[in-house]
Each structure stands twice: as structure tokens, then as C-alpha cells.
């Protein structure tokens, strides 16, 4: 199966057109604002470009994308990353996490991650980091630690940062069994311990 044009558009938007040949740390630096920022203009751009495709993916209308590594990565991005921009601060931001997680596990079972550039593998793995299941968190740590050991020296600092971020997610799930910073958005009551935790720096992502 050739890469569907819409999948190619998702990948080019998220990583840049030269993402498969540029060193991972350079891709990460260039795309930083898109990936980790909270910019209403970027969110609006994601919405106008990809909301219809996100909804199609959520309705299993793009299941055939699971047949190639790059298309499967694009599918995971549509279900895991794009909703966090398009539906920021609403329950819908997390509504497709379970489906994204299923596709990530499928990709790992097929060894798809080994066919992708290192920077792409981070985003293939991220549904595990977003999961409130401790087994997923432990799997994520295992994967990202192994990946960080495999990259070139120039990329090491970037991937060590991803390991640190994964560790922070793991610690929260290990302690609370969920991400307390999602409670308000999802209408979940905080425990006293969670409320105290949320006053601390680094308690949300």
C-alpha cells in the first residue's frame, strides 16, 4: 500500500517535509512550538486542516492506514496529538486516547517502530505516556530509554529530555493512578492529595 496523500500531509505538517532525512534534534528544535506550545493560532490551524480527518479516524474510517508504518504513525498523530490542539481544555482532547493506544500497541506488536526515524518513534509511543495505566507507563519508559541509548551523540540531549518527561508521567500515574491535572476538564473530583499536588510546579503538562 502506498502512503495515502492525506497521511503524507499529516506527517509533513507535524514533522516538516524533510523529517525523514534531517537529524532528529534539528526536527525537534524546529517543530518545538507546534509540538509543545499552547498557541491558539496553531490550534486553529490544526482544527481547520485536520478536524474532519480526526473524526474520520475516530470512526474507524482510516483503519487501512494501519497497513504501512508511516500511515500508521499519521493515524496515531490524528488520534493522540491533534485532539490535544483541536480540542484543548475540553474532554474531547482525550476522547480518542484509547483508540490511539490500541494502534500504538498494534504498531509495536508488528515491529513498525523499528522502520521509523527516531523522532517519529517518540510520537508513535506517546499514547502510552498519555495513558493512565501503569503498565503502559512502564512500557513507555522501557521504549524511550532504549531509544535514547540508540541515537547519535548529537541527538542524545534531546532524547534524554524525552526520557525525563516519560519518567515524570510515570511517577504521577504510579502515585495517583491518573493525571490529576485532567480532573477539572473531565469533571472528576480531586482528592485532597491531588489538590495539594496541583499547586506544585510541574504538576500538569
Question: What residue ranges belong to the model's regions?
Answer:
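Intrinsically disordered, low-complexity activation-like regions
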Residues: 1-90, 94-205
Amino acid at each position: 500500500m502506498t502512503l495515502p496523500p492525506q497521511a503524507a500531509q499529516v506527517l509533513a505538517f507535524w514533522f516538516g517535509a524533510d523529517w525523514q532525512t534531517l537529524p532528529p534534534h534539528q526536527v525537534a528544535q524546529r517543530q518545538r512550538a507546534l509540538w509543545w506550545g499552547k498557541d491558539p493560532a496553531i490550534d486553529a490551524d490544526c482544527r481547520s486542516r485536520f478536524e474532519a480527518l480526526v473524526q474520520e479516524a475516530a470512526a474507524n474510517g482510516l483503519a487501512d492506514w494501519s497497513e504501512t508504518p508511516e500511515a500508521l504513525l499519521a493515524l496515531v498523530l490524528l488520534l493522540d496529538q491533534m485532539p490535544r490542539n483541536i480540542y484543548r481544555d475540553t474532554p474531547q482532547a482525550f476522547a480518542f486516547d484509547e483508540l490511539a493506544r490500541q494502534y500504538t500497541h498494534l504498531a509495536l506488536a508488528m515491529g513498525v517502530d523499528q522502520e521509523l526515524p527516531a523522532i517519529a518513534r517518540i510520537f508513535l509511543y506517546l499514547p502510552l505516556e498519555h495513558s493512565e495505566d501503569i503498565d503502559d507507563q512502564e512500557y513507555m519508559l522501557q521504549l524511550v530509554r532504549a531509544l535514547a541509548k540508540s541515537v547519535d551523540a548529537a541527538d542524545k540531549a534531546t532524547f534524554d529530555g524525552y526520557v525525563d518527561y516519560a519518567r515524570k508521567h510515570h511517577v504521577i500515574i504510579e502515585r495517583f493512578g491518573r493525571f490529576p491535572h485532567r480532573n477539572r476538564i473531565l469533571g472528576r473530583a480531586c482528592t485532597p492529595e491531588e489538590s495539594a499536588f496541583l499547586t506544585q510546579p510541574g504538576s500538569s503538562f
